[in-house]
C-alpha cells in the first residue's frame, strides 16, 4: 500500500529555481504600478522621519561597481528605517556641471567643438548630462533602489542653481570671498584650476637634480638645493632653510658648499662625493637675509627661514618659487615678501617672462633647463625618482601649482576654520576614525579656490570695470542674477548683455563707471554639490535639515562632506548632517585596484543580467564595507551558492505552511519544548540582527541570518520537526505547534532579509497567505518585535546542553553508518549511559521528545558508573512504511499493513 498521499508533504509555487533575471524586472514593474515610493511614505505618514540625503553621483557614463555599492548601501539603510516605522523619503540627485562632462562632450564633438560658442557648448553639455541622468536612473532602479525617481534633483536645474547663488551671496556679503594671485593646483591639459578634492595621487617618474647657487659676494661659496621640478627654477626667488637645524660649510675641492648637517652624508652619497671636510657649523637662522645668485637668470635669490623645511630628503635648503607652491607662496611671498614669478600659461607653456624658455612646454623645458645647468657648471647630480605625485581626476595627467588670479573662500574669516572644527564634534562619525580624518583635513586645508576656467559650470557673476580695471562682485549683483537664473537658467550669463545682467543704475563702486564687462569664471563643482542641503533639504517639505545621514565613500571627507559642512556652518552655523557613514573602495580578489587594462573589472549590470540584483546586494551585505572590499566573478559565484541556501530555506518554510492559518496558531505555553526553544532562539536572532542593522553593520546581520538559515534551521530545527510536520495529523497540536514557529520564523526572516534581498523577499511575501493582515509590499510590514516572554531561560539553558549531546549522538550515528550497522538514523536505537545526575535528570525531563530530537527510532537513558557514553544498535521491530521509524508493534493491524501504531492512529483519525 502506498501511504505517500497520507503524508503532509510540503507544497508551494515559490519555485526552487530563482530565475531572478526574469523575475526582478516583473517585481520592478509591480513597484512602479503601485508607486511604491509614495505608498510607503503615505503608509508611514504620521511617523517620525529619517532622511538619508543622497550625495549626487556624477552624470557621466554607465554606473560602475562603486556607484552601485553606494546606492545599494543607501537603499539598505532606507529600507531598514522604513521597516522600523520611520517615514524615510529618499530623493536621488546628480552632479551635472564641471570638467568631466565638458571634456566628454568636446571629445565627442571633435573639431566642431572649436567653432562653437560658449552657449552652444553649454547646451550640448546640458543635453548630454540629462541623457546620462536618464540612463543612470534606469540602472539604479534595476538594482532595486527605491526613491523619488520622478522628482530627482540635479545641479543644473534653475531652482537648484538659484539656491547656489543664495549661498554665494551670503559668502560674499559676510566677507568670505576674495580674489588674489596665488598658486593653485592647475591642470595644463584641461586648462583649469582644481580643488584638492579633484586630485588623485599616482606614481610618477620625475627628474631629481642637485643644484648649486653661488652666494653673493663670494668667489667659491655655494648653497646646495635639491628639486624634482626643474621647470620651476625660472620662478625661483628664494631659498628656505630651517631656523633651528644645524647647517655646515664643507670644503669640496676648491669650493665651499652649504647644506644641512643631518642630510650631509646622504646628499654626498647621492652626488657622488667621497672626500670633503667640514669647516664650520651653525644654525640655519644665521643664513637668513643672505643672497644667492640664480644659476640661470640675472637675479638674486634671498635666503629665508621656514619651519616646514624637513630633514628627510634633499639638502635642507629648499628652492622657493612663490608662483608654484602653497608653502612657497605663504612663507616666501606673504611672510618674507619674495616676488611671485609664474611664467607658465594655462596650457603649460612658458611665457615671455621665462626668457629663452618662452614658448616651450614645461615637460620639454625640464630637459633644457637641466642641460643649461650642466653647461654652466651649476648641476651637481641628475637622476630619476619615482614618487607619489598629484594628477588630475579627469584626464589623469600630472598637475602643477601655477599662480593665477582666482576667487577664494577664506577659511580664517569670521573664525571659520575653528567653527567648522567645533561643529565636527556635533556629528556621529561611522566609523569613528572619520572624525579625526575630516578634522585633520579642515585643520590643514588652505583657503578654498572656488573659481574654474571652464564653460560648463555655474558662472560667477563678476564684472571687470573697463575704466579702472577693478573686479566687481557683491551680494546685490549675485542676488539680482539669481532672479534671472530662476527664470532662464545660468545660460543667461552667456546669452544676455552686461546691461541686461546688471541691476538698473548699477555703477562701478570703485570709480563710478557704467562700463562693466562680465567675466567668464565658473564655480567649483564642490560649491554646486555642497549646496545641496540648501537646494534640496530646506526646500522639499518631506525632507529635513539637517539630514539624519550622509553616506558616501571615505574620499568624501575631503570632498562632499567637507564642502557641505563648510557652507552649512557659514549659512546656518551647524552641520548639514547628524550622522556621516562612510564606505571603503572596491578592489579585485587580490586587493588590486580595478582597471579595464588589468581585465579585473566587475560590471554590476552584467551581474544583474547573469545572476540578478539580489545576488549583488547579498555580496555587498556580506562585505565589511567600512573598509576596502573585494569582488571578482568567483566571489560573486560564492554568493550565488549562499543565495540558494537562503531561498531553499524560505521555500521549505512556505511549503510546510501551505495549510496553515494564523487562526491555527498555538499559544507559547502549549507548544512542544523544542518549539518553545526555537521561538526563543528566534527572539535572540531578532535582537542580534536588529543591533547589527542599528549600527549599520550589515555584514554582521548577514552572517547571523545566513548561519541561522543554514545551521540552526536547516541542520537542526527543521531537521528535527520534519517528521512531525510530515507524519502527524494535519490539525494536531504537535504539527500546529511546529507550524506556528515556522510562520513566525518565515515572517521574521522575510522582513529582516528584505533590506538586502529586496526582490526575493517581495516575491516570497506574495505567497504569504495565512489569513493575517497583509500589505501590498513586504516593505510596509513592521520590523519583528523582540519578545522577552518567548525566552524561557531555563528551557534555553536545557537545550544548550541537549544540543551538545545531540552533536555526540550524531557523531556516534555517523560512525555506525560508516560501519554498515545502519543506513538512515531512523534505523537506530540509541542508548545514552552516564553517571551524571544532572545529565540523567535533563534527559528524563525531555525523554518524551528525544526520539524526535535525535531523529532515531528509540532512545534509552541508562544510569552508569562510567562517564557519558553513547551506544548505537539497530532498532528493534519492523520499519513503518509511512514514517520509516522502527517499532515492535508495526504491522499489528491488518487494516493498515506495515504501519506503526502512531501512524495508524493518524490514519484512523483522518478517516
Curated annotation (Swiss-Prot):
Gene Ontology terms for molecular function: aminoacyl-tRNA deacylase activity; ATP binding; isoleucine-tRNA ligase activity; tRNA binding; zinc ion binding
Renumbered ranges of motif 'HIGH' region: 57-67
Motif ('KMSKS' region): 593-597
GO BP: isoleucyl-tRNA aminoacylation
Known EC number: 6.1.1.5
Localisation: Cytoplasm
Domain of life of the organism encoding this protein: Bacteria
Record GO cellular component, one term: cytosol
Protein name as annotated: Isoleucine--tRNA ligase
Protein species of origin: Pseudothermotoga lettingae (strain ATCC BAA-301 / DSM 14385 / NBRC 107922 / TMO) (Thermotoga lettingae)
Amino acid at each position: 500500500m502506498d501511504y505517500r498521499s497520507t503524508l503532509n508533504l510540503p507544497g508551494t509555487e515559490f519555485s526552487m529555481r530563482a530565475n531572478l533575471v526574469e523575475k526582478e524586472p516583473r517585481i520592478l514593474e509591480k513597484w512602479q504600478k503601485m508607486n511604491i515610493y509614495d505608498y510607503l511614505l503615505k503608509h508611514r505618514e504620521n511617523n517620525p522621519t529619517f532622511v538619508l540625503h543622497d550625495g549626487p553621483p556624477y552624470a557621466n557614463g554607465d554606473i560602475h561597481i562603486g556607484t552601485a555599492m553606494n546606492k545599494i548601501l543607501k537603499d539598505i539603510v532606507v529600507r531598514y528605517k522604513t521597516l522600523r516605522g520611520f517615514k524615510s523619503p529618499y530623493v536621488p540627485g546628480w552632479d551635472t556641471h564641471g570638467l568631466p562632462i565638458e571634456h566628454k562632450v568636446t571629445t565627442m564633438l571633435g573639431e566642431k567643438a572649436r567653432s562653437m560658442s560658449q552657449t552652444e557648448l553649454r547646451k550640448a553639455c546640458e543635453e548630454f548630462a540629462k541623457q546620462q541622468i536618464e540612463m543612470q536612473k534606469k540602472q539604479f532602479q534595476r538594482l532595486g533602489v527605491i526613491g523619488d525617481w520622478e522628482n530627482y534633483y540635479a545641479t543644473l536645474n534653475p531652482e537648484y542653481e538659484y539656491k547656489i547663488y543664495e549661498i554665494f551671496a551670503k559668502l560674499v556679503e559676510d566677507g568670505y570671498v576674495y580674489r588674489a594671485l596665488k598658486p593653485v593646483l592647475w591642470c595644463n591639459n584641461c586648462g583649469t584650476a582644481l580643488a584638492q578634492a579633484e586630485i588623485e595621487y599616482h606614481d610618477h617618474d620625475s627628474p631629481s637634480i642637485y643644484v648649486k647657487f653661488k652666494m653673493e659676494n663670494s668667489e667659491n661659496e655655494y648653497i646646495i638645493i635639491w628639486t624634482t621640478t626643474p621647470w620651476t627654477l625660472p620662478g625661483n626667488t628664494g631659498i628656505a632653510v630651517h631656523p633651528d637645524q644645524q647647517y655646515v660649510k664643507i670644503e669640496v675641492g676648491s669650493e665651499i658648499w652649504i647644506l644641512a648637517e643631518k642630510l650631509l652624508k646622504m646628499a654626498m652619497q647621492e652626488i657622488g662625493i667621497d672626500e670633503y671636510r667640514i669647516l664650520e657649523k651653525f644654525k640655519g637662522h644665521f643664513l637668513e637675509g643672505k643672497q644667492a645668485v640664480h644659476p640661470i637668470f640675472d637675479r638674486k635669490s634671498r635666503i629665508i627661514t621656514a619651519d616646514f623645511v624637513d630633514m628627510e630628503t634633499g639638502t635642507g635648503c629648499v628652492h622657493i618659487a612663490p608662483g608654484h607652491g602653497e608653502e612657497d607662496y605663504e612663507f616666501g611671498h606673504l611672510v618674507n615678501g619674495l616676488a611671485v614669478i609664474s611664467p607658465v600659461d594655462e596650457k603649460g607653456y612658458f611665457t615671455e617672462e621665462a626668457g629663452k624658455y618662452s614658448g616651450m612646454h614645461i615637460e620639454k623645458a625640464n630637459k633644457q633647463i637641466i642641460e643649461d645647468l650642466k653647461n654652466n657648471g651649476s648641476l651637481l647630480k641628475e637622476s630619476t625618482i619615482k614618487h607619489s605625485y598629484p594628477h588630475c581626476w579627469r584626464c589623469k595627467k600630472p598637475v602643477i601649482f601655477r599662480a593665477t588670479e582666482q576667487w577664494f573662500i577664506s577659511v580664517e574669516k569670521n573664525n571659520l576654520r575653528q567653527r567648522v572644527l567645533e561643529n565636527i564634534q556635533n556629528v556621529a562619525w561611522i566609523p569613528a576614525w572619520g572624525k579625526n580624518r575630516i578634522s585633520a583635513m579642515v585643520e590643514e586645508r588652505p583657503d578654498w579656490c572656488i573659481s574654474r576656467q571652464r564653460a560648463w559650470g555655474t558662472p560667477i557673476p563678476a564684472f571687470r570695470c573697463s575704466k579702472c580695471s577693478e573686479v566687481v562682485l557683491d551680494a546685490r549683483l549675485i542676488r539680482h542674477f539669481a532672479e534671472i537664473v530662476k527664470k532662464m537658467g545660468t545660460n543667461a550669463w552667456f546669452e544676455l548683455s552686461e546691461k541686461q545682467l546688471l541691476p538698473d543704475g548699477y555703477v562701478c563702486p570703485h570709480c563710478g563707471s557704467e562700463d562693466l564687462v562680465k567675466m567668464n569664471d565658473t564655480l567649483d563643482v564642490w560649491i554646486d554639490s555642497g549646496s545641496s542641503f540648501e537646494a534640496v533639504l530646506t526646500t522639499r517639505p518631506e525632507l529635513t535639515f539637517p539630514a539624519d545621514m550622509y553616506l558616501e565613500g571615505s574620499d568624501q571627507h575631503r570632498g562632499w562632506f567637507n564642502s557641505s559642512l563648510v557652507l552649512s556652518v557659514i549659512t546656518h552655523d551647524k552641520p548639514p548632517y547628524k550622522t556621516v557613514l562612510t564606505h571603503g573602495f572596491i578592489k579585485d580578489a587580490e586587493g588590486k585596484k580595478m582597471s579595464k587594462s588589468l581585465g579585473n573589472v566587475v560590471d554590476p549590470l552584467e551581474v544583474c543580467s547573469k545572476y540578478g540584483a539580489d545576488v549583488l546586494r547579498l555580496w555587498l551585505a556580506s562585505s565589511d564595507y567600512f573598509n576596502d572590499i573585494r569582488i571578482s566573478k568567483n566571489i560573486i559565484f560564492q554568493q550565488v551558492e549562499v543565495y540558494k541556501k537562503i531561498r531553499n530555506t524560505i521555500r521549505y518554510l512556505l511549503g510546510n505552511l501551505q495549510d496553515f492559518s494564523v487562526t491555527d496558531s498555538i499559544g507559547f505555553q502549549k507548544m512542544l519544548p523544542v518549539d518553545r526553544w526555537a521561538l526563543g532562539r528566534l527572539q535572540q536572532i531578532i535582537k542580534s540582527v536588529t543591533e547589527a542593522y542599528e549600527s549599520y553593520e550589515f555584514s554582521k546581520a548577514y552572517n547571523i541570518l545566513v548561519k541561522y538559515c543554514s545551521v540552526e534551521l536547516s541542520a537542526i530545527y527543521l531537521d528535527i520537526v520534519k517528521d512531525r510536520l510530515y507524519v502527524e495529523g494535519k490539525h494536531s497540536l504537535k504539527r500546529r505547534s511546529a507550524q506556528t514557529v515556522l510562520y513566525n520564523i518565515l515572517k521574521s526572516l522575510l522582513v529582516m532579509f528584505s533590506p538586502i534581498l529586496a526582490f526575493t523577499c517581495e516575491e516570497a511575501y506574495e505567497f504569504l497567505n495565512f489569513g493575517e493582515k497583509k500589505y501590498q509590499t513586504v516593505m510596509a510590514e513592521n520590523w519583528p518585535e523582540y519578545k522577552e516572554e518567548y525566552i524561557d531561560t531555563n528551557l534555553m539553558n536545557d537545550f544548550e546542553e541537549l544540543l551538545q549531546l545531540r552533536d555526540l549522538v550524531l557523531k556516534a550515528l555517523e560512525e555506525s553508518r560508516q560501519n554498515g550497522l545502519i543506513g538512515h538514523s531512523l534505523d537506530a536505537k540509541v542508548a545514552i549511559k552516564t553517571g551524571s545526575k544532572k545529565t540523567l535528570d535533563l534527559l528524563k525531563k525531555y525523554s518524551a521528545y528525544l526520539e524526535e530530537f535525535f531523529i532515531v527510532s528509540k532512545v534509552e537513558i541508562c544510569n552508569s558508573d562510567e562517564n557519558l557514553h553513547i551506544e548505537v544498535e539497530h532498532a528493534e521491530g519492523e520499519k513503518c512504511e509511512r514514517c520509516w521509524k522502527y517499532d515492535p508493534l508495526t504491522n499489528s493491524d491488518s487494516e493498515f499493513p506495515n504501519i506503526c501504531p502512531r501512524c495508524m492512529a493518524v490514519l484512523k483519525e483522518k478517516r
